[in-house]
Structures are given as structure tokens and as C-alpha cells.
């Protein structure tokens, strides 16, 4: 069996510590029977595990089912009043550093904001502070904000750092003033914003230049929104129907390649531009840029992001 399959098996075993049938029962209790995948998916996933443990190659259908089950074990806790929700025991047993991360990330949660277009009155993505008035996001987020011109004027867009579920946004809106820089080849942009008011406890995020490693626990923080045309049914239940508000999404690094970090956090549309934190250090190891739910999620790596920021600070 190839090293890739061995790594996949290790990832699956870190997540699925019981037979798949037992995992399905736990998930059914969380999201309800109507939102569950078919029992056939569970059978195929168990076959994939059994095959890899026997040093055999599973079929593509079996692997797809196994990936589906792994993603069922990737929660999306809410941020409330500047703190992340505690994970249910079913998930905290997987992400053993979560409690420490809840504390270490607190100074940075109000530095992650939802980017809204004032012309369309829609949110288009996520951004985060890398300096007092400098916001990092994706180039394609800027493309949506600027209608493809890659230029912004005051009054076109704002960022909201306090948009949380069931918590009044006392921080208000912050105007985005202009485009500072676009990366030539990577999906990154830097935007200048107004200085957040003194009531905003905003601390610029620290970017890690050392490469993340396969299997590292990571967390995407951003503002996922609903997309009924792309999201499976269980997403509505897993997210409790609450979209467009600040959430964390724990997962792990699946693969590292040149200037990219592939991860399996539960990111949706709206997470574009989200910081990918190391769960151990609360440092940013990437900026989320793209994803296909249940297939792959991709971020630009921290070293490339740090170099880009250094050129413009």
C-alpha cells in the first residue's frame, strides 16, 4: 500500500475511533435521522477502512464514502461574545487541544471580520487583520467586491468584526478604504481599512512561516454562508441553520504542496479569506482560498502569506 494510503488510514483512525455504525449513531443524535446519509455510505466507508487495514487498495466509491464519514466528524462551533463554543465530547476526544485553543485564540477573534459589499448588500467573504489597518483576504473576494476592477473606493465595502450569533454587534462597521496590494500569482489581497474604534479589541494575527505538517490540527475561522445548491442536507443540521456569523471549523492538514495547505475543516462559501490557525499555537498557517465540500479545501501557506505582508507593511 502506498504512503498516501497509509497517511489516509492514519487520518481516518484518528477521527473514527469506533466502528462506522457506532459513528453513524452518534451523528444521528446530533443532526437527526432525516439529514443522515444512507446506510450504504456507512457500509462502504467501513469496507474502505477494512481494506486499508489489510494493506489493500479500496475502491473509489469506498474512499468517497469514508471521506464523507470523516467530514461528518468535523464540527463548526459558534463564536459568542468573543469566545468559541465548547466542543461536544464526540468531537473533543478527536481535537484534544481544543480547550487550550479556545483560550489562546481569544485575543484574535475580533480581528476576523465578515466582508460585505454595500452595493449588493451581500457578504462576500472573510478577512483578518495583519496590521492595525491592514486586512488580508483573497483576491477573488476583492474581485467580487470590485465587480472585477480590482479597485475600491470608500463607500463600496465594509468589514464587520463583531457579527456573531445571538450577540448584538456592538463593534459596528469598519469602512474598507482601498486596495493596498494584489499578489501576482496567489489568491491573496491586502486592503486598507479605517482604524477600528477603541471598543474593538482587535489584535493583528501572527503568521507562522514554518510549514504546517500532514496531520496537524488546524482551525478555520470565518463566516460560512448557506448554499443549498452545493451543500448536502446534513449541513443545515450541523450548522443549526445559522449562517453568515462567526464560526470556527476544526480539522486537520491533509496534504502540503508548493505554497498550498490542503485541509478538511468544514468550510463553506463565505469562508474565502479565513485564517487557518494552528490549534496548538493559534498562529496562522494559511489563508483559506478554495474548497469543494467533501472533496478538498485549499489554503495559501503561511510562508507565502507572511512574505506578501512583509512587502507591504
Descriptions of predicted regions:
Residues 2-18, 22, 26, 33, ...:
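C-terminal subregion of chymotrypsin/trypsin-like serine protease catalytic domains
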Residues 23, 27-31, 70, 94, ...:
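Weak global preference for isoleucine
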Residues 1-125, 245-248:
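Protease-domain processing segments flanking chymotrypsin-fold serine proteases, especially trypsin-like
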Residues 103-124, 128-269, 277-280, 297-303:
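Serine endopeptidase catalytic core focused on the charge-relay Asp
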Residues 13, 18, 41, 46-47, ...:
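Residue-identity detector for glutamine
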Residues 83, 87-98, 208-212, 274, ...:
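Short, solvent-exposed coil/turn linker segments
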